[in-house]
Curated annotation (Swiss-Prot):
The lineage of its organism: Eukaryota, Metazoa, Ecdysozoa, Arthropoda, Hexapoda. The gene is env. Keywords: Glycoprotein, Transposable element. InterPro entries: Retroelement_env (IPR012014). Glycans are attached at residues 3, 59, 167, 325, 363, 383, 403. This is Retrovirus-related Env polyprotein from transposon 297.
Length: 471
């Protein structure tokens, strides 16, 4: 048997505390920092490490040629309302594509040389990297998966239109080509708008490739739209991640230093460092010099503000509490029905696991900060009747059955009316008629032999004579 005396007592007490920590109880550590903030590791995030590029190429010169052809034909030969409507619609759709006019004739051509980034969601590093690869060799460097089928009309449209010149149904053929071309321009406009918003465009993927794309990866997609001045082409690219890396993140928590100053910081985001740059959990590069220096463990250039309190008890996470400049206080611990009292003071970090604690009449628990979610529906559930698909023959049969039922009901009602009339005419009315005849005979007899009866007469209102007007 060991006696807890002398130097063994504090060592044994420390051992008991450590055992309690690893036994899912409570952990209390000193905070030794004088920076004005604390750094906490947060949940790791999945960051794309490599991408697969899917693109759509649009030849602006060929679009201009096709538009000019339609315009010339409308000026000379054809004035069908459908053709004029579609042509005007094409011009409206092209006007929505926000590119500069090269000249009066061109709708969306631009003068320049090489590739230029128009818009998208690439950061500066990705943009520069992709532009270099495009300038060197698009096919070998970026490995674009092109969808030439999507612009098949533009590639061979002129040949088809020339073949229709000798056809008697040229109006119908021209109308059909206009419809196809209009649909293509609408797809082009939609593709550019989705690229501007950073949304995935399914038209940039063949069905077989779309099957192999992870939906989670699509959420991390990047988009870019480029203009190739040399070939007068617009290039719309979807950058779909094919590999994701798990990276730990760091959260910055303001915490007073020994002089009572803490970091002037209110953001709740977490950050990570990659290739000497700092990003937030949305994978966007952080430009704040204060934050980037803190994450990189450099001398931060930040603003600090004084705290206006003598001591602090503060939540950090649902299971973590920090204290600052705390006077000696009793911490009541309730872990798995084991109740203890612990004296704490100063700057401490308290981690709770499956426990409840009380400090200065403030109760804390591991799940105290987790929100209670009310799953009560905000609407009255609908009683939905299952709909059965009815065929044509079934409908005819149902109508026939309903008609038969209606006829039967009508016949029953008619028979009931006839029976009721017969009953009233020949059965029920006869006693009443006999009674009426007897009463009439008795009345006649009373009139022939009047009897002295006292009848109380009901007084009538007095009738005053009229007074002639005085002349």
């Amino acid at each position: 048997t060991l006696n807890f005396t002398g130097t063994w007592y504090p060592i044994t007490l420390l051992f008991i505390l450590i055992t309690a920590v690893h036994g899912q109880q409570i952990q209390i550590n000193n905070i030794d920092t004088n920076h004005g903030y604390l750094l906490f590791s947060d949940k790791p995030v999945q960051i794309p490490s490599s991408f697969e590029h899917h693109s759509l190429k649009i030849n602006l010169t060929e679009i201009d040629i096709v538009v000019d052809y339609f315009e010339q034909r409308l000026r000379t030969d054809y004035h069908a309302p459908q053709i004029n409507f579609l042509y005007n619609k094409i011009k409206r759709e092209l006007a929505r594509i926000t590119l500069k006019h090269r000249n009066k004739r061109g709708f969306i051509n631009i003068v320049g040389s090489g590739f230029k980034y128009l818009f998208g969601t690439l950061d500066e590093n990705d943009r520069v990297e992709i532009q270099k690869k495009l300038e060197i060799n698009v096919h070998n460097s970026v490995k674009l998966h092109e969808l030439n089928d999507a612009i098949r009309l533009i590639n061979d449209g002129m040949q088809k239109i020339q073949n229709y010149e000798n056809n008697h149904t040229i109006i119908d053929s021209l109308l059909f080509e206009l419809m196809q071309f209009t649909e293509y321009i609408e797809d082009l406009e939609m593709a550019m708008q989705l690229s501007r918003l950073g949304l995935f465009n399914p038209k940039l993927l063949n069905y077989d490739k779309l099957e192999n794309v992870n939906s989670q990866n699509i959420l991390n997609i990047k988009t870019s739209t480029w203009i190739n001045y040399n070939d007068n082409q617009v290039l719309i690219i979807s950058h779909i991640p094919i590999y994701l890396s798990l990276i730990s993140t760091i959260k910055i928590i303001p915490y007073p230093d020994s002089n009572g100053y803490q970091l002037d910081y209110t953001d709740t985001q977490s950050y990570f460092e990659k290739e000497n740059k700092v990003y937030n959990t949305e994978n966007k590069e952080v430009k704040n010099e204060c934050v980037t220096n803190i994450i990189k463990h450099l001398n931060p250039i930040c603003n600090f503000k004084p705290v206006h309190t003598n001591e602090i008890i503060k939540y950090i996470e649902p299971n973590t509490i920090v204290t600052w400049n705390l006077t000696q206080t009793i911490l009541n611990q309730n872990c798995q029905n084991s109740i203890n009292k612990i004296k704490i003071e100063g700057n401490k970090m308290i981690r709770v696991t499956q426990c409840k604690i009380e400090i200065n009449n403030i109760n804390f628990s591991e799940t105290l900060l987790e929100p209670e979610i009310d799953l009560t529906p905000l609407y009255t559930p609908l009683n939905i009747t299952k709909i059965k698909i009815v065929k044509h023959n079934d409908i005819i049969e149902m109508i026939s059955e309903n008609n038969i039922t209606l006829y039967i009901q009508m016949i029953i009602v008619i028979i009931a009316l006839i029976l009721l009339y017969s009953y009233l005419r020949y059965v029920s009315f006869k006693p009443f008629m006999m009674l009426y005849a007897k009463l009439k005979i008795r009345k006649n007899q009373n009139q022939n032999t009047p009897q002295q009866t006292e009848i109380e007469e009901i007084p009538f209102p007095t009738l005053y004579p009229s007074i002639p007007a005085q002349v």
